[in-house]
Amino acid sequence: MSKSSKLCCKTSCPRSNIFCSLVDKVFKRPSLQSLHQWGYHCYEPRVYRTLAKILRYVDLEGFDILLSDYIAFVEKSGCHLEVNFNLEFTEICVNTILYWVFARKGNPDFVELLLKKTKDYVQDRSFNLALIWRTFTPVYCPSPLSGITPLLYVAQTRQSNILKILLQYGILERENNPINIVLTILLYPSRVRIMVDHELVDIEEDAKTCLVLCSRVLSTISIREIEMQLSLGRRPIISNWLDYIPSTRYKDPCELLHLCRITIRAQLLTNNMLPNGIFSLLIPVCLQNYLNLES
């Protein structure tokens, strides 16, 4: 099966790269021949429908191809496309990809593949290929300008299996103010039950797991900030939330073993080697797992 047939299912693609093909379709529309007529309202529906048709049914192999096509497109498009159109088009593509991966599929395997394919770009938050830092709209709308990052969305929905992957890749450690993620996990209103594999998830239990995972990354968690929010009338999703934050994160001295984990992970993060670099260290497997936040 060719690359285009794997990606497009029943829709044939005239070019090997799905994003180049989309641009060609946009250019061929008579209403878009003049630059002054370009804008989200003109071509966003077509881009979204095309990518949604792919992402709705795509498997991991097809998603790998789609990400490879997007990376190749972004790396070359800047030289060939009008600047504003290029920015708008890539924003629509990123918004659609993140929406389907995080809000619709919620599949850890897809999230990990996305991180693997784009980890080399994650240090530049402004780059279109640093997908994990881009914003998207969880309830899909054309413009992602008022959206949220994948990490914040996962914290809001308490998807602990996906949060663990993001943390293993050092995404929380790269946050400027990681306590905001803890506050979101604990205090964000739970409006819906999350479906995973057609089963209802216990959000409270997932929230507990999320707090434990964050405690494996952070050296301190400000209880004062949490209590300040509670004093303003906000309600925690977990009544006994303090039981899930080790006392060594807010009161007692931090464990030496945990401080070593933080230091080693920070060095690996600086060299963009999380999490794979952990498993090249000549240490026992149990310590590798500890560094990888398994315990």
Curated annotation (Swiss-Prot):
It comes from the Eukaryota. Residues 232-295 form the SOCS box domain. The keyword Membrane does not apply. InterPro entries: Ankyrin_rpt-contain_sf (IPR036770), ASB17 (IPR039147), SOCS_box (IPR001496). GO terms for biological process: protein ubiquitination. PROSITE patterns: SOCS (PS50225). Keywords: ANK repeat, Ubl conjugation pathway. ANK repeats lie at residues 146-176. Coiled coil: none annotated. SMART domains: SOCS_box. Pathway: Protein modification; protein ubiquitination. Belongs to the ankyrin SOCS box (ASB) family. May be a substrate-recognition component of a SCF-like ECS (Elongin-Cullin-SOCS-box protein) E3 ubiquitin-protein ligase complex which mediates the ubiquitination and subsequent proteasomal degradation of target proteins. This is Ankyrin repeat and SOCS box protein 17. It comes from Bos taurus (Bovine).
